[in-house]
Amino acid sequence: PKTVRRQRQMCIRDSLNSIHFGSPSNKKTKSLLRGVVQGIGGYGNCIGVPTIAGQTSFDESYNGNILVNAMTLGLVKKDKIFYSKAAGLNKPVIYVGSKTGRDGIHGASMASAKFDDKIEEKKPTVQVGDPFTEKLLLEACLELMRDDSIIAIQDMGAAGLTSSSVEMASKGKLGIELHLDKVPCREENMSPYEIMLSESQERMLIVLENGKEKKAKEIFDKWNLDFSVIGKTTNSKNIELYFEKNKVANIPIDLLSEEAPEYDRKWKKSKLPQKIKFTKKDFKNLKITDVLKKILASPNVCSKEWIWEQYDHTVMGDTIQKPGGDAGVVRVHGSEKAIAATVDSSASYCYAHPLSGGKQIVCETWRNLICVGAEPIAITNCLNFGNPEKPENMGEFVECVEGLNEASKYLNFPVVSGNVSFYNETKDKGIKPTPTIGGVGLIKNYKDMITMDLKETGNIILVVGKTEGHLDQSIFAKEVLNEKKGPPPEILSLIHI
């Protein structure tokens, strides 16, 4: 008999993360690092999704704002893809998953807010996750997806019910009517405002075909999850909100989506820094063994095994290249194919010259996939920047995006998704520009996978490409010579784009 996994139309395969912390000497870094690693490991391990790759970096610019970027990779049959575009009139709008609480209210705005000494007061805006409920919700949704019940489905992420309902209606050029007193709540006396903006985790919004409510409810009841018909689609092109029979809001959908105001920020073009003129005197008193030890001891170079060993990277039994290599690799169950995935970023390159830095990250992602024998397919991104109201920060954003665009076009490496996080600053001091790139590649036969470990004595070692001796922005320059200035290395193939 076939296994349950093979019967599924889709499944979550793997997760990756890119986490950035302040200087190791900062008093909060150790506890923040431990907490983040425990959170990623605890949630991922409980839900049964392997964490196959990631990166960890340290820089004083993150002393006030750490970054936790996560990427999840799924597998789906191409003719069984579900979308978030609502369609049809008077279709039932269904709330499923956990109950709504006050946790996470204003969480999205906090993620793009400047921090000050009162940051501890924002703890109530942090969502409380429950991996066991998430696992139940995942299984229930997959079960419902086995027939033709679902018209549209979307998770309640940033801004909760507000974003999911507005986005689904906007994509379908429809209106939506919601009765908020029908939303399952775990706290008493929640206002319509709180219900709409709550970011409580483990919740989904579904538009169903008429007549499918009973069957769908039976599925979610079986998994011990909340199920409630909270509204319907309309032709009003408005979002209409009711609470205890009173209309509390009636807003045109387009004003919240396609016709929302767009900022035209002023931005400042960056200048390529001058190369540092290193001389023989800089290296005269250096011993190669001491240099090597210092580089290997750097927090940004040393082994991160103690971190990723806390993650379950083999659950599901398909991981064939664990963390620590150029990319994680998992086989596609029931076939000879394998999927490679990696996450990369380089804040120092982007800070030195955003345009060049943006190109560098895309190329590094490409190289990492190639190095495990994969054919690069596509990338996603998480663009982390400071205050866009400052022309220099907005300039970093503009030029990094231009660099990402140029490199992805040159490599035929399409960007298929992504998000942006602004206002990452504390006490008016922002982070270095940190675009994080996630890349996916395909290995047609997993037996052709390549690993980075040396195989046997006598193997030939080759250097591919021209070595220019570029030291600016290198770990050597920073850790040994204490020199942090200079431009990032050029990408020769992209110079004339």
Model-derived segments and spans:
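Intein/HINT protein-splicing elements and their conserved insertion hotspots or analogous self-processing inserts
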Residues: A86, P92-V93, S98-L138, L144, ...
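Flexible, glycine/charged-enriched surface loops at secondary-structure junctions
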Residues: R13, I47-Q55, D148-M156, E177-L180, ...
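A glycine-rich phosphate/pyrophosphate-binding beta-strand-loop-alpha-helix module
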Residues: R13-I66, K118-E120, L355-E425
